[in-house]
């Protein structure tokens, strides 16, 4: 009789539905670390751009999430035989909606909107260029928003790889208002 009970228990354990990790539950938090290319990235070129950022993401009902963080973006603008760096330091607050996920809760696709505010520095505040020309663009406080398409792929219960595509629009500065970013990152779930 014990043998039959053991066989029934083993068969129930093997043939019933699988248990999956509990992900994106309300109030779960994660630390996101990202690296992006900005407006295309030409290795060794004069017009490449990149950004680095970190954020705290807090999940809500239905797998949506709030994201609060900071970002550093550097874009080099070509000028004669050199380049003029434009750096942006921004803080972000936004809400991302889960638009797609698989049944096993491994891959999530989010679409989100964020408010951005920060500071822009043109040529690190130096007005005179290397050839004696005067730069009329100035350092300024900037504000605006961003639209983001974000993909999370869980490789473990507390670690997810990120891929994102983002369009930033910022006003208040003297340089370009729009920046397209694409990149990758990691999300470490802490709670």
PLM regions: where:
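Short glycine/proline- and aromatic-enriched beta-strand/turn motifs that initiate or cap beta-hairpins
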Residues: 20-75, 187-191
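Outer-envelope beta-barrel architecture signal
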Residues: 23-31, 62-66, 87, 105-111, ...
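Outer-membrane beta-barrel domain signature
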Residues: 52-53, 70-72, 76-78, 120-121, ...
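Gram-negative (and chloroplast) outer-membrane scaffold detector with strong preference
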Residues: 55-130, 159, 188
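Outer-membrane beta-barrel "beta-signal"
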Residues: 92, 178-191
